Amino acid sequence: MLVQLNHKVHVLFRRQDLDMVKLQGKTVIVLDILFATSTMIAALADGAAEVLPALNEGHAREKAAGFERGSVVLAGELFADTIAGFAPPTPMALMAHDLHGRSVIYATTNGTVALNDAAGAAHVYAGALLNAAAVVEHIARHHADTTILIVCSGSMGNPNLEDMYGAGCFVELIANTLGAHDLSDAAWAARALYRSEAAESLLMRCRVGQMMQARGLAEEVKFAARESVMQVVPKLVDGRLAPFALA
């Protein structure tokens, strides 16, 4: 599908709609609310030195081979199941591990793939409800003159309600900070969704949220529904997400 990116703020509802050529010069925020980007942000807030988003289990193990034993934590999922031998992919469960000062290599079905897909942009950030205000503050300060593209990871080629909602949260904050005069229709739609319902309510009733509750992960969903409670701004540089310190 051809997506026009001639607006100041645009939203893609699926990672598959990314156009690698049109990424050049743009600022990209990648979202996977349940749970990839929420987990990576939480890990960095909990003291991890960095997070390396991997495409899959094999890619993660390949990356881990370059680290000293004990300095790295492998975590992730495939089709929502924890990869055998890896730490769990959800925020609270991963934070139960000793992450302080260690590198986290993290592989997921959608979110980490989207981050890798977006790597050709001028600036790439991992965003979630958890750090929305911090990311927008940073972008407004450093990249206000660029086109901002919010990428929803989605699920297996389909849009996810929680990612669309998260995109709306970012659009709302960007509009309040930089103005709402040049939003794409997709950005307006995401903003309307965000304004329609509280975060926890929507995340608990969406398809992925219900699936996670059936797996006993209701508290993880509630954790990911908290808005702007973390100051971590993870920027992707050379395949690594490290926290960008707010000035």
Question: Where would I find each of the regions flagged by the language model?
Answer:
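Short active-site loop/helix that positions an aromatic residue
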Residues: 39-46, 63-64
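Long, charged alpha-helical interface segments
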Residues: 85-123, 137, 161-247
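A short glycine/serine-rich beta->alpha loop
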Residues: 26-27, 153-159
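Short acidic, Gly/Ser-rich segments with clustered Asp/Glu that frequently serve as metal-coordination loops
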Residues: 16-20, 28-42
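N- or domain-start disorder-to-order transition segments that initiate the globular core
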Residues: 1-12
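Glycine-rich anion-binding loop/nest that anchors nucleotide
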Residues: 149-155, 178
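Structural motif
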Residues: 9-10, 26-29, 49-52, 70-74, ...
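Acidic/Gly/His-enriched mid-domain segments of enzyme catalytic cores or analogous surface patches
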Residues: 52-145
